[in-house]
Amino acid sequence: MTMTLHTKASGMALLHQIQGNELETLNLPQFKIPLERPLGEVYVESSKPPVYDYPEGAAYDFNAAAAASASVYGQSGLAYGPGSEAAAFGANGLGGFPPLNSVSPSQLMLLHPPPQLSPYLHPPGQQVPYYLENEPSGYSVCEAGPQAFYRPNADNRRQGGRERLASSGDKGSMAMESAKETRYCAVCNDYASGYHYGVWSCEGCKAFFKRSIQGHNDYMCPATNQCTIDKNRRKSCQACRLRKCYEVGMMKGGIRKDRRGGRMLKHKRQRDDGEGRNEAGPSGDRRPANFWPSPLLIKHTKKISPVLSLTAEQMISALLDAEPPVLYSEYDATRPFNEASMMGLLTNLADRELVHMINWAKRVPGFVDLSLHDQVHLLECAWLEILMIGLVWRSMEHPGKLLFAPNLLLDRNQGKCVEGMVEIFDMLLATSSRLRMMNLQGEEFVCLKSIILLNSGVYTFLSSTLKSLEEKDHIHRVLDKMTDTLIHLMAKAGLTLQQHRRLAQLLLILSHIRHMSNKGMEHLYSMKCKNVVPLYDLLLEMLDAHRLHAPANHGGAPMEETNQSQLATTGSTSPHSMQTYYITGEAEGFPNTI
C-alpha cells in the first residue's frame, strides 16, 4: 500500500535524518579520500521524474519541494533507483527507511547516456573519484555507491570543449596531412615523388640512379668530388650526383617491402603476424618497425662503391685507359751535364709528371670515392714511388740505363755528376733488371702502380702530426679488389706453384721501391737545403708534405720545428699548390674523363 506524506516539514525531517546516518557511515577511515579540488553545486536533471518507493508503500514527490533550499546540498531532487530490494529490510530503518549501512554497496543505478564526469555522493569537505560514462546510446547500468549528481551547466561546458577540441583537431590533422604530403628528395632537395631505391627521391634522381646502376657509370668529377648537388645544379656533375645517391642510402634492392601500389600514403600497411604490429612513423604513415636502421648501423654500414662490382677485365681496362701520356724533357744535347743542369732537368720533368699523376689517380677505379683529404694524403705519401716504378718500367728495354724521357736516357756514369745520385741509380737499375727477368707485363704494371697508390698511406706513423685516413676500411676493400685483379692476371697462365711464387716476388718488389723512394726523398731534400737548384712549387710542396708524414727528422732537429719552418717558406701559399692542381685539374692535353 502506498502512503503519501502530507506535509513538507515531515518529509524534510526524514531527509535530514537519512543524510545524518549517511554521513556517519562515510566518516569511517576507509572512506576518507584526500581532497583534490573543490566541488561546486550539483543538480539532478529536471527531465527525469524523481520518485522513491518506500518499504511500506509510501511515496514522496520531491518535485513539490523543489522551490525549497536544501540545508546541505542546495537545490536537489534525488532519484533513488527501484525499490524492489528495499522490502527485504523490514521496518528496522527510521520511518520505514532501511539504514544505509545495511544496504548492499552494489545497487544498480540508471545513468544518463551522454558522456560526462559524475561525482559520487560525498560528505562536505571530502572529494571522491569520478567515473566516466561514455556509452554510445541508451541508458547504461553501472554499479556504484550512492547516486550520481550532475554539475550545473555541464552540457554547455561539454559542448564548448567539444568545439574547441574539434577546431584544434582540424588544425592538427591539416598540419599532419601537410607533413605527410610534403617530402623532399634526399639527393637534390627537390620535391620527392615517392620512395625509390631505399630513400625518398624525385623522379629525376630516381631515373639517374636507375641508369647508373644498369649501364656504364664511370663518371669523373672535373673538380674535387665535392660538387654541390641541389635542384638547380644536380645535372652539373654526374660523378658527385651518383656519389651522393650512395651516401644518402640509395641501393639497387632498396624497395619498400609493404608497397601495394598507388599512392603509398593512402594505404594502411600491415606486417606479418610473426613480426608484430607496425609502428607509426613521425609523419603518420605506418612502416615496419625494423625498416629504418638505427643511426649506429648507418654510421658503421660499409660504404658502397661501384668499383667493387667491376670484373677483373673491366678493372684492367680502366687502369690501362687511365695511363698518363709520355712527356719529353727539356734536355739540350749541346750543353754538358753538371750537378745543377741535371737536377734542373730531373726536377722540371718530375714537376710536370706530378700534374699528370693527379689526373691519373682520379681515374683509378675507386680512388674518387674517397674523401678529398684521403685522396691528397695518399698522393702525398706515394708520389715518388709512383714516379720510380714508372721509370723502371720504361727502362726495362734499356739494360744499364734509365729512360727518364724519350729524349733523356742516362747511364750510371752520367749520374756521378750529382753528389749522392749513384747509389739511387744503382737501386733503380737493379729493380729494372729484376722486372725484366720476371717479364713484367703492362697489365701487371698498372695493377702494381695502383696498389702503391692505395697502400702508401694506410699505415700512418703514430708520431705523425697529420690527421690519419678517414676511410681506411673502404681503402682496404678497393686494395683487395686490385690484388684480386692481379691474381686474376696470374691465373691466366694457370695456378701453378711458379705463378704463386711470381705473385709473391712482384709484391716484394714494392718494398724495394718504397726503400728507393725514401732514399730519393733524402737526396732531394739535401739538394734543396744546399740550394743546388730551385724546386718548382708543386714538387716542393709534395716534398714538404712527405717529410710531414715521416716519423722523425734524420737531421736530428725536432720534426715539428722543421715542418713549421718549411711550411712558412714553401708551397702552402703557392698558387700552384697540390690543392690548386687538384681542384682545377690542370694537365697539358690530358682529359679528365674516360
Curated annotation (Swiss-Prot):
DNA-binding residues per UniProt? Answer: 185-250
Polar residues bias: where?
561-575
User: Where does the record place the region Transactivation AF-2?
Assistant: 311-594
Question: What segment(s) does the record annotate as region Hinge?
Answer: 251-310
Region (Modulating (transactivation AF-1)) residue spans: 1-184
Q: Name one GO biological process term.
A: positive regulation of nitric oxide biosynthetic process
Question: Where are the compositionally biased (Basic residues) regions?
Answer: 257-269
InterPro entries named among the record's database cross-references:
Est_rcpt/est-rel_rcp, Estr_rcpt, Estr_rcpt_N, NHR-like_dom_sf, Nucl_hrmn_rcpt_lig-bd, Nuclear_hormone_rcpt_NR3, Nuclear_hrmn_rcpt, Oestrogen-typ_rcpt_final_C_dom
Q: Which Pfam families match?
A: ESR1_C, Hormone_recep, Oest_recep, zf-C4
Residue numbers bearing the Asymmetric dimethylarginine modification: R260
- Chain residue ranges for the region called Mediates interaction with DNTTIP2: 185-310
Q: Where is the lipid attached (S-palmitoyl cysteine)?
A: C447
Stretches annotated zinc finger (NR C4-type): 185-205, 221-245
Q: What is this protein called?
A: Estrogen receptor
What species is given as this protein's source? Equus caballus (Horse)
